[in-house]
UniProtKB/Swiss-Prot annotation:
This is Monooxygenase CPUR_05417. It comes from Claviceps purpurea (strain 20.1). The keyword Metal-binding does not apply. The keyword Transferase does not apply. InterPro entries: Fungal_Meroterpenoid_Isomerase (IPR050977), NTF2-like_dom_sf (IPR032710).
Length: 157
């Protein structure tokens, strides 16, 4: 049986607010302990990441990017499948130019509906083909930006 739609809807709202808040704490607040993130399309060849692998990547990205703005264009919530989809555009400033990434994020909730268990993110491949090499170079030159470990998932909401 699926958790109540209201619980999932609240978790979705908190996930989007955390993403838009653009801090490590706000982003990780709704993620379960066994959370995974899979970059799409599959042709990009990026592996799925758990909390431990995602943390340094996001830490670097959040350290490097300023003036982050998330614009949500569409949200679809399917409570019976414990899932949602968000179409958004993320904008910001980086040391090597503007960041403008269209994304479709597929979200799955845990059995209680109070945490996000998995996301699959479909990125703008044209933008990412240009951005990723610049970001990887910056991350190698700024290794301290990826410091730390993710906080444990808090099971209370």
């Amino acid at each position: 049986m699926s958790p109540p739609a209201e619980i999932q809807a609240d978790t979705l709202k908190r996930f989007i607010a955390g993403w838009g808040g653009w801090t490590m704490e706000s982003f990780f607040a709704t993620l379960s302990d066994d959370f995974t993130q899979k970059p799409l399309p599959l042709s990009c060849g990026e592996p799925a990441r758990g909390r431990e692998q995602l943390y340094p990547l996001l830490s670097s990205l959040m350290t490097m990017m300023t003036n982050f703005k998330l614009t949500i264009h569409n949200t679809i919530h399917d409570p019976s499948n414990k899932a949602a989809v968000v179409y958004a555009v993320a904008d910001g400033d980086t040391p090597f130019g503007p960041y403008h990434n269209e994304q479709a994020v597929f979200i799955w909730f845990n059995s209680k509906g109070d945490k996000v268990d998995r996301i699959e993110e479909l990125f703008d491949t044209a933008f990412m083909a240009e951005f990723k090499p610049k970001f990887k170079k910056w991350a190698l030159e700024n290794p301290g930006a990826a410091a730390g470990r993710p906080p444990p998932a808090n099971t209370s909401t």
